[in-house]
């Protein structure tokens, strides 16, 4: 194989292009680009300079395919296109991290304070942050609650409760839900909390101190003590008075690396405001330069729909600015400026996203190392040949044999792989038989379209009866995968779980051991996904049956309503005009639908 590879290199052109490394059964192992194809492919023969991962890859290469391009820009775009469509196993892997956490204050009449991650909804919330960690958000919210007595309950709870909750009893909320505070006074507290989050602590402290002195002069010592306590809690909040605004639409990027992992941080500004930030993790990148990593990332991030802003700021060590500009223009037909920081404001923003990316990378690596420790213990306990890279966990859910759903969740060395979760709708005739349900799920999993992906370990939510079912399915399909069944103990308390493995006595683990807690986490995640999937299926059927009762709503209109609103509750909250906007729904029919669903309010879903 290596001799054949060397022969191909000899005939390779010294021009710009893209190369595709192909292994056994025409499997695409790697796709790369180069200014000089012959020179780049020759580099792979310098084994002493290659990482272990790339050495293993080269040993599997049977042939190399070459695509000559006009220039580097065309090569960059073609490489990105081929990687997206073919997903080679040895290429850089891009994973979204959790977005950085923010504090939100809602635009409700009685605003709620909460932690938030995700896309911004500026018509619903005011955003403050981002914060470096969820713990920082939690501590800040707690101090703001104590200082300003703001509510954290949901809007639904707020509108329906008749008495103050525990937050009021422990002096963390002023109970606006039951009029323990006037709307004006509550909104003043909200404004002071907002000023604090914007770094105006001194002004807020001055206001509180002035009010405390006034109460004291009027001998209202009880109220003076309240403001004294507010001042104390306010001093615990250390907000950075950094200006998170930018005059132009712009994205700021950082690249932080350690070993084979990189974190690219993105801080976005649109309409002169902070539009959110998120870390992306790049795996298998030790053989790539920072310029290669960032340019590849950018042509994957932006597209004609998700268009880049007019300005993109990158660290000073990024040199291929012109190539990135030209590639983004070719991709979006939009002129983009890729810039280095020119003033203190721009440098501050680049430093901010760099520091947050550094924190995210450190947290990611810490989590990874902790996971590896647990997986090594799991390997020993269940006598696995290697530390598992892919664990699949199975669970079923139904109510009296109805809306039966089986699920598979997947965990790897870095945590849950939610994009690989699967749901299995169970056949009706099984009627709640858990053993038959598990047989069907496993049979479909290992004979379906992902049958070639073999996990390193299976964890089944079940007892000794499930062991023979799993064994039988795997034997019939000629698949060898180690597995264990995990059942709750006699009292069904967490920590008393029993494990059942073929050819071994049942056993348990110490309730506080890391492995037991990890296995409980896996089982609970599968259970959560099963319950959620079952509930969605049940709600969908209930939704369909509710609409079937309405004269004039046939299968086509029912499908349109289901697609548009998703639930009966959402229809009941909609306006007449919104229902009319659904294709095929007239004003008269919209009135009938709205009247019908509102008459059914309170029906359990």
From Swiss-Prot:
Describe the location of the UVR domain by residue ranges: 202-237
> Which InterPro entries does the UniProt entry name for this protein?
GIY-YIG_endonuc, GIY-YIG_endonuc_sf, GIY-YIG_UvrC_Cho, RuvA_2-like, UVR_dom, UVR_dom_sf, UvrABC_protein_C, UvrC
A single GO cellular-component term from the record reads: cytoplasm
Q: Quote the Pfam families the UniProt record gives.
A: GIY-YIG (PF01541), HHH_5 (PF14520), UVR (PF02151), UvrC_RNaseH (PF22920), UvrC_RNaseH_dom (PF08459)
* Taxonomy, superkingdom: Bacteria
Q: Which GO terms describe its molecular function?
A: DNA binding; excinuclease ABC activity
Q: What is its main location?
A: cytoplasm
Q: Where is the GIY-YIG domain?
A: 14-92
Task: List the SMART domains.
Answer: GIYc (SM00465)
Name its GO BP terms in alphabetical order: nucleotide-excision repair; SOS response
Q: Does the keyword DNA damage apply?
A: yes
Q: Which SUPFAM superfamilies match?
A: C-terminal UvrC-binding domain of UvrB, GIY-YIG endonuclease, RuvA domain 2-like
Which UniProt keywords are given for this protein, alphabetically ordered?
A: Cytoplasm, DNA damage, DNA excision, DNA repair, Excision nuclease, SOS response
Intrachain S-S bonds: none
Q: Where in the cell is it found?
A: Cytoplasm
Determine if Chaperone is one of this entry's keywords: no
Q: What does this protein do?
A: The UvrABC repair system catalyzes the recognition and processing of DNA lesions. UvrC both incises the 5' and 3' sides of the lesion. The N-terminal half is responsible for the 3' incision and the C-terminal half is responsible for the 5' incision.
The family annotation for this protein states:
Belongs to the UvrC family.
Its quaternary organisation is:
Interacts with UvrB in an incision complex.
For this protein, the record's PANTHER family field holds: UVRABC SYSTEM PROTEIN C, UVRC/OXIDOREDUCTASE
Q: Which HAMAP family does the entry link to?
A: UvrC (MF_00203)
- What name does UniProt use for this protein? UvrABC system protein C
């Amino acid at each position: 194989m290596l001799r054949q590879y060397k022969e191909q290199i000899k005939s390779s052109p010294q021009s710009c292009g893209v190369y595709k490394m192909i292994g056994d059964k025409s499997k695409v192992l790697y796709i790369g680009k180069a200014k000089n194809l012959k020179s780049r492919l020759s580099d792979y023969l310098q084994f002493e300079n290659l990482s272990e991962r790339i050495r293993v890859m080269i040993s599997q290469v049977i042939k190399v395919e070459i695509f000559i391009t006009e220039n580097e820009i065309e090569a960059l775009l073609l490489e990105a296109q081929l990687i997206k469509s073919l997903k080679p196993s040895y290429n850089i892997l891009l994973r979204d991290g959790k977005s950085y956490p923010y504090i939100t204050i809602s635009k409700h009449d009685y605003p709620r304070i909460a932690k938030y991650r995700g896309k911004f909804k500026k018509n619903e919330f005011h955003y403050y942050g981002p914060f470096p960690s969820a713990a920082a958000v939690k501590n800040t919210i707690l101090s703001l609650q104590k200082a300003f007595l703001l509510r954290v309950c949901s809007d639904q709870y707020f509108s329906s409760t008749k008495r103050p909750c525990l937050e009021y009893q422990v002096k963390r909320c002023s109970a606006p839900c039951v009029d323990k505070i006037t709307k004006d006074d509550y909104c003043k507290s909200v404004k002071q909390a907002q000023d604090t989050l914007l770094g105006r602590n001194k002004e807020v402290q001055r206001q509180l101190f002035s009010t405390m002195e006034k109460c004291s002069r009027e001998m209202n010592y009880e109220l003076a003590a309240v403001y004294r306590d507010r001042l104390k809690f306010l001093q615990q909040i250390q907000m950075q008075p950094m200006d998170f605004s930018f005059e132009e639409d712009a994205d700021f990027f950082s690249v932080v690396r350690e070993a084979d992992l990189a974190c690219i941080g993105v801080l976005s500004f649109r309409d002169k405001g902070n539009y959110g930030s998120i870390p992306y993790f790049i795996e298998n990148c030790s053989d790539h330069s920072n310029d290669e990593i960032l340019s590849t990332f950018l042509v994957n991030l932006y597209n004609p729909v998700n268009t880049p802003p007019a300005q993109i700021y990158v660290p000073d060590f990024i040199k291929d600015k012109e190539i990135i500009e030209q590639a983004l223009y070719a991709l979006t037909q939009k002129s983009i400026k890729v810039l280095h920081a020119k003033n203190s404001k721009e440098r501050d923003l680049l430093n901010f996203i760099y520091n947050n990316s550094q924190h995210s990378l450190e947290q990611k690596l810490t989590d990874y190392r902790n996971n590896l420790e647990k997986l090594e213990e799991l390997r020993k306990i269940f006598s696995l040949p290697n530390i598992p890279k892919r664990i699949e966990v199975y669970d079923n859910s139904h109510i009296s044999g109805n809306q039966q759903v089986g699920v598979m969740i997947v965990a790897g060395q870095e945590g849950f792989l939610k994009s690989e979760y699967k749901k299995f709708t169970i056949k009706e005739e099984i009627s709640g038989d858990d053993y038959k349900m598990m047989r069907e799920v496993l049979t479909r999993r290992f004979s379906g379209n992902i049958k070639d992906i073999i996990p390193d370990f299976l964890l089944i939510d079940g007892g000794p009866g499930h062991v023979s079912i799993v064994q039988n399915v795997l034997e019939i399909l000629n698949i060898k995968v180690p597995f264990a069944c995990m059942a709750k103990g006699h009292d069904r308390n967490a920590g008393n779980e029993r494990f059942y493995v073929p050819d071994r006595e049942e056993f348990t683990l110490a309730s506080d051991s890391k492995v037991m807690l990890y296995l409980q986490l896996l089982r609970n995640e599968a259970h959560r996904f099963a319950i959620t999937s079952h509930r969605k299926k049940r709600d969908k059927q209930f939704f369909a049956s509710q609409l079937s009762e309405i004269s004039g709503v046939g299968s086509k209109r029912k499908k349109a309503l289901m697609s548009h609103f998703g639930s009966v509750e959402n229809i009941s909250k909609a306006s007449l005009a919104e229902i009319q906007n659904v294709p095929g729904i007239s004003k008269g029919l919209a009135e009938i639908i709205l009247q019908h669903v509102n008459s059914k309010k309170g029906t359990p879903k």
